[in-house]
Structures are given as C-alpha cells and as structure tokens.
C-alpha cells in the first residue's frame, strides 16, 4: 500500500485524492495532509481519514512513501528538501521551480545522497520518453509553442501590461527562453521546464493568447542527431483551474498509479 502525503490541498491535491478514493489509483491511500489554509486540509482529511499536519516538518515525519507537492513554486524547495532528508520520495507538481538550475542540482544531488527519488509528471505534454532517448544523441534545438485562451493567461497578461479584453485576435505575448517564460507565466508554462529537463537543453518558448481558443495547445519540436520529434497536443482546460490542462492533473494521477503497479510501460 502506497502511503501518500499531500502538501497543498487545492485543485490538484483534491483531484489526486478523488482518484485514490474512486480506485483509479489502486493500492494507495492518503495518509497525511497539510495546507496553510486549515479548512482546505480539514476537508481533505474528512474525506480520507488522513492526519491533518500542522506544518511541512510535521508531515514529513509521518510514515509515508511519497510526498506530493501541490502547493506553489515558492514552496518546492522546502517541501522537496525536507521530504528527501526524512527519507521520502517526492512528486513535484510545480516543476517551474526547477528552472532555477542551482535548486535543481541541489535537490538532485540530495536525492542521490539519501537514495530517494524525485518524480516530475509529464504534465500537459507528451513525447517525453522519446525526448529522453533523443538526448542520448546530441540535442540541437528544443522549441515549445503554447496557445491558450486569453482567460487562461489573464493574470500574467495583466502583469505584462496587456488588457485581456482588448485582445481580439491571436497574438504572440511571449517569445524567449524557458527561464524568462516561467518567471512571466509561473502558473501557465510549467511544461516548458519539464521539457527542458527531459531534453537537458533549454527550450525556446513561444506563448500565444487566442481569444477564440477553447483548448490548451502545445506544439513541441525537438531536433537531435538521432532524429527529430514533432508533437502537437490539444488539451481540455482543467475544470478546477482553467489556467492549466486537465492532462496535467491526470499525468500526476497516472504517475502515482504506476508507482503502485508491478509493470511499468515506456521509457
């Protein structure tokens, strides 16, 4: 039985809990929860019987196999570091935090030292198994073009000086490297960091705001000395949080489910 602790009892934390309770994730249980908002943690606890923890320190001392970070980019370092030090594997949803190379290397080296694992879901994109194989050759180019409804990008657009209501046609609102992309669109473009980590190559990112779009669209291009990969995925927005894709939540569910299963498919 896989014993799970959840840090962050919002949309993703609730979705994972739902999939444990309905049997989609088999041989697993939610054992402990923590959120700065006590009421959110209480709601999850009442549904699962999980212990409500008073802090991250409290949670990582519980008898857990896996800690799920579903909180925020800012919380990743504390959650991941304390989980690993306390001999827990950790699943990171806010992958954008790992655009900070120093943090990525710090957590990677810590996991190696303590003999634990850091899991990064594929999120709203596909093809990562092929990309990991392609990087065994020489990666030459990695490009991610993301198109989302204006409403999904609204907060970031306002911060950049756009008036979302004035966008009547598709417009490129960002073009640059993965590091700048995650700073300007922290709630929308975690996949660019996941892609860059998989390729071990910094992605060029293009973000398009489309007032007519109903789906979140990701177009990947990866060129390697071994071959070239093109992938296009159109995702339904996540109902509980339209800034991201439903596939991002389901990818975490699938990863956790695989951890509890005896057969692993794919690279």
Curated annotation (Swiss-Prot):
GO terms for biological process: NAD biosynthetic process. Its EC number is 1.4.1.21. It catalyses: L-aspartate + NADP(+) + H2O = oxaloacetate + NH4(+) + NADPH + H(+); L-aspartate + NAD(+) + H2O = oxaloacetate + NH4(+) + NADH + H(+). The keyword Glycoprotein does not apply. Keywords: NAD, NADP, Oxidoreductase, Pyridine nucleotide biosynthesis. It is an enzyme of class 1 (oxidoreductase). SUPFAM superfamilies: Glyceraldehyde-3-phosphate dehydrogenase-like, C-terminal domain, NAD(P)-binding Rossmann-fold domains. One of its GO terms (molecular function) is NADP binding. Pathway: Cofactor biosynthesis; NAD(+) biosynthesis; iminoaspartate from L-aspartate (dehydrogenase route): step 1/1. The active site is at 218. NAD(+) binds at residues 124, 190. It comes from the Archaea. InterPro entries: Asp/hSer_DH_NAD-bd, Asp_DH, Asp_DH_arc, Asp_DH_prok, L-Asp_DH, NAD(P)-bd_dom_sf. The iminoaspartate product is unstable in aqueous solution and can decompose to oxaloacetate and ammonia. Specifically catalyzes the NAD or NADP-dependent dehydrogenation of L-aspartate to iminoaspartate. Belongs to the L-aspartate dehydrogenase family. This is L-aspartate dehydrogenase. The gene is nadX.
């Amino acid at each position: 039985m896989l014993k799970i602790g959840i840090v962050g009892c919002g949309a993703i934390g609730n979705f994972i809990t739902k999939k444990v309770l309905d049997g989609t994730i088999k041989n697993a249980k939610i054992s402990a929860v923590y959120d700065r908002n006590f009421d959110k943690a209480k709601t999850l606890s009442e549904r699962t019987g999980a212990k409500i923890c008073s802090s991250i320190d409290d949670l990582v001392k519980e008898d857990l196999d896996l800690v799920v970070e579903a909180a925020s980019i800012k919380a990743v370092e504390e959650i991941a570091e304390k989980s690993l030090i306390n001999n827990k594997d950790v699943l990171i949803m806010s992958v954008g935090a790992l655009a900070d190379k120093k943090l990525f290397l710090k957590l990677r080296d810590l996991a190696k030292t303590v003999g634990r694992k850091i899991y990064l879901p594929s999120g709203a994109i596909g093809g990562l198994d092929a990309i990991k194989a392609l990087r065994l050759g020489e990666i030459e180019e990695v490009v991610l073009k993301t198109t989302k409804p204006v409403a999904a990008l609204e907060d970031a657009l306002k911060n950049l000086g756009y008036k979302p209501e004035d966008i009547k046609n598709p417009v490129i609102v960002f073009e640059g490297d993965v590091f700048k992309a995650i700073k300007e669109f922290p709630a929308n473009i975690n996949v660019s960091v996941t892609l860059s980590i998989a390729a071990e190559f910094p992605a060029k990112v293009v973000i398009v705001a489309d007032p007519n779009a109903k789906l979140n669209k990701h177009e990947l291009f990866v060129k390697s000395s071994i071959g070239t990969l093109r992938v296009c995925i159109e995702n339904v927005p996540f109902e509980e949080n339209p800034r991201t894709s439903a596939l991002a939540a389901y990818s975490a569910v699938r990863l956790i489910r695989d951890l509890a299963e005896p057969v692993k498919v794919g690279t």
